[in-house]
From Swiss-Prot:
It comes from Vibrio vulnificus (strain YJ016). This is tRNA1(Val) (adenine(37)-N6)-methyltransferase. Keywords: Cytoplasm, Methyltransferase, S-adenosyl-L-methionine, Transferase, tRNA processing. It holds the Pfam family MTS. It is found in: Cytoplasm. One of its GO terms (biological process) is tRNA processing.
Amino acid sequence: MKSGTLKTKGFKFKQFSIASSNSGMPVSTDGVLLGAWADFHHSQNLLDIGTGTGLLSLMCAQRYAHLSITAVDIDAHAMEAAQENFSHSPWHSRLHLQHGDVLKLNFTHRFDGIICNPPYFNSGEQAQATQRATARHTDTLAHDALLLRCRELLTPNGKANFVLPLTEGEQFLQLAQQQGWHLHRLCRVKPSPNKPVHRLLFELGLSTATTSEEHLTINDGSTYSAAFVKLCQDFYLKM
């Protein structure tokens, strides 16, 4: 691990820290859920699309010692934040950054794993800050274009993992089906037992598979649920 401290205060996990003030993507529960849930045991080369602060890449690097990870983002400030976070992590030698539009970037190889926390504001209200808008608005990365690009970049037996709010996730899955993707895994997430499902975690592949479905409740009363703690305890400091 390189010596030194992060220049910017941020969010500290058990094995790494995230400085996020220069990026439109602060640490979110969505990102932590996806990074903890996605399964890349059989992958060798992972592509993190829209890396932001690098959270997903760092989580996957911590979980899978064999992974070589390429992280891309169109936003220069996000690249700066990710570079800082990567350089102070124990896995910096396996983390590679590329600045640019994933729809236009050229890669030397395809990937057997893709992870992405996609933008999901389709129209109407824009985020106030420009970087936040870039991170969350589909004007910069439409879902149909994202899925098509993932098809081009994924190996035949590879897997692509995403997280989206319920409505946007259902629409995304419809687009995926139209493009010939297969739903391998699906997790419906709700914030508490009496609240409706508000997030979808899902794994897509180009090969046929029987869909594995599960449910996750984040809070159980005034505390985190046992299932949420089991999923995220390797990352959050107070678990």
